[in-house]
Amino acid sequence: KSPMSHPRLENLNIESVAPLATPREMKAAIPLSAAAAATVARGRETLERILDGEDPRLFAVVGPCSIHNLDAAEEYARKLKTLADEIADAVFVVMRVYFEKPRSSIGWKGLINDPYMNDTFHIEEGIRMARHFLFRVAEIGLPAGTELLDVLMPQYIGDLVSWNVIGARTAEAQTHREIASGISTPIGFKNGTDGSLGAAINGVRSAMGPHHFLGVTEDGLPAVFSTTGNAYPHVVLRGGKTPNYDADSIAGCVDALRDAHLPQNVVVDCSHGNSGKKADRQGLVLRDVLTQIEAGQTAIRGFMLESNLEGGNQPMQANPALLNPRCSVTDECIDWPTTEALLREAHARMSKLMRQNSESRIQ
């Protein structure tokens, strides 16, 4: 027995380790076009201007709870782009493009993790599909917003994203706050699943400062990343045990941000805890939010809707071919006609308000 033999200490619970294309290789395989790059940059710059209060419009992050069929999702994107152009003078539309689903327990973790929805976990193909879909959305001319869940994902798809959000289950995580401080987009922090604001406000504060953390370069090499801090983190209110979109909750959040000497920017997620997971309640939430803006609440900068071609949701199937490509497999969504009606209402009310505000400034 050689003196060098040790008991096996590593990878005791690892079945296999498969190499993955580097971010540089993936970007070379699916490169940005000038048109796509312009969409992403315009999206980021517009969101920054809205968050700075220089642009009086409201932004709307609208799209499926999760994407499971790319053809249906592209059809959705084209419909959304047509509508976005019609309402662009008062509402700036970003498509919600979620490929990763944080699960409270277990379940399908999204297109990147298991693109074929059959427990084959072809993650490299999932990343390629995600990157290619984001490229298509950018080519259509829609900025995209997504959830920052896997900490390596920004290296693979971050150049195609205009808005990121850190979800309720990860807003307290040090790793995500560090990445938020270095990410190239405005970034939302959701309140905790229990409704508490502390994690989101501390997340905003943390992301605004510099950090030093470990990551992987475009060539897949470990490196230390040192960040300057992100000037555009904001709180996303998604409800908890009870909703938190009402005027008192929003005023409380604004006060907490002011007390912490942080920018008073709030986005309302009309779904999740604010809708009690009932998709058709999203309209009530949005109307309440618009009423608050009309009453002079200036901290509300945007809202989120979970929307799909068809409403409701469907259970997962052992045979994914049996799934309806146009209906959510995760949270309930509102259908397209409802989405269009709500966005047009938001546009009409914001247009009127912006007109009144500009007239009162002239006088």
Question: Where are each of the predicted segments found?
Answer:
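Active-site-facing alpha/beta catalytic cores
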Residues: 5-10, 77, 90-245, 249-250, ...
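Gly-rich Lys/Arg/Thr-decorated short loops/hinges at beta-loop-alpha junctions or inter-strand turns
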Residues: 23-31, 227-239, 327
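Conserved phosphate/anionic-ligand binding catalytic regions in large, soluble enzymes, centered on
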Residues: 59-72, 331
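Internal helix-turn-beta structural module
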Residues: 308-354
